[in-house]
Regions:
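Short acidic, hydrophobic short linear motifs in intrinsically disordered regions
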Residues: 24-38
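Short alpha-helical segments that sit at the start of domains
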Residues: 1-26
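A short, conserved structural fragment
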Residues: 55-65
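Short, amphipathic alpha-helical interaction segments positioned at domain boundaries
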Residues: 74-83
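Short amphipathic alpha-helical interaction segments
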Residues: 41-56
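Minor-groove-contacting beta-hairpin "wing" of winged helix-turn-helix DNA-binding domains
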Residues: 67-72
Length: 83
């Protein structure tokens, strides 16, 4: 698995956990700390790279204070629920 594939896999896992945390409701703020804990990501910089990727894809928005809290978009919920 190359680095890009690894990033996509981790981003999908983060998205799936965030969808579960938000109970599938768009616009619901989720916590970076809870998502990091549930996905076993301990490196803040790694999480921030993943969050930026998800933001660029239009799956999350409204990241506050380095994505300490963020919301899922309709597209993000649909993508996270696909798998």
């Amino acid at each position: 698995m190359n680095e890009a594939e690894g990033m996509r896999d981790k981003a999908l896992r983060v998205l799936q956990v965030a969808v579960a945390e938000a109970r599938g409701e768009p616009g619901t703020y989720v916590s970076r700390a809870r998502i990091m804990q549930q996905t076993n990501i301990s490196d803040l910089q790694e999480f921030l790279r993943i969050a930026e990727f998800l933001d660029e894809q239009g799956f999350i928005a409204e990241g506050v204070n380095e994505h300490e809290f963020f919301v899922l978009t309709l597209e993000g919920i649909a993508e996270g629920a696909r798998y």
